[in-house]
Amino acid sequence: MENLKIIWHGHACFSLIGKKHVLVDPFLTDNPVAKVKPEELKPDLILVTHGHSDHCEDASKISKNTHAPVVAAFELSEILKEEGTETIDINPGGTIEYEGIRVKATIATHSSSYNGRYAGNPMGFVIDMGRKIYHAGDTGYFKDMEAIGAMDRPDIALLPIGGHYTMDVDGAFEAVKAIKPAIAIPMHYNTFDLIRADPERFKALAGTVGTYVIIPEIEKPIEI
């Protein structure tokens, strides 16, 4: 099975690196905990879960620097095209394949706008790079996470735990029980005061149902 390296850049931004480099939710320029600059990242494909600036602030810039297309909801894709960004549009339930990477969009319970403009449905992604990674995007817990677990069978789940705008630790624990991943990695917490959360508590809860939680450190690679 292909080796996978996961690098957390803070907030909900991850590099998933196998034979190709997939970058999810690039938010670096105004991210107070980020340690890399947009121009330092060289992805082959960029995924954006929704239009809020703390998830796609640097998508166009990185795309133009690297020629990596941005996968986004149809409405957000059309807006990014106006900026001269190469995009691949998708909507929940849809699947795209790009250079051996398979990406399926899932629903997410959130909102989406881009500079005040409606930006389509918020989404999560199941990314198949030999192993399946579910990036939930910004979302609360929803019952259909059981279907994601049953149908898509992700090996790894990247789940928000910060509360306020997304599910909190308890909601993420419900997500773990629904999805049943072997590994879970918390995200979208401790970037700002409003989303303070304790990842150790999440780790303890998830361990009671057999999911191993890896608490990420910014820019420290996780080898799986």
UniProtKB/Swiss-Prot annotation:
Keywords: Hydrolase
One function term, GO molecular function aspect: hydrolase activity
Domain of life: Archaea
Alphabetized SUPFAM superfamilies for the sequence: Metallo-hydrolase/oxidoreductase (SSF56281)
Keyword Ubl conjugation: no
Family: Belongs to the UPF0173 family.
HAMAP family assigned to the protein according to its UniProt record, in alphabetical order: UPF0173 (MF_00457)
UniProt protein name: UPF0173 metal-dependent hydrolase Ta0764
Source organism (scientific name): Thermoplasma acidophilum (strain ATCC 25905 / DSM 1728 / JCM 9062 / NBRC 15155 / AMRC-C165)
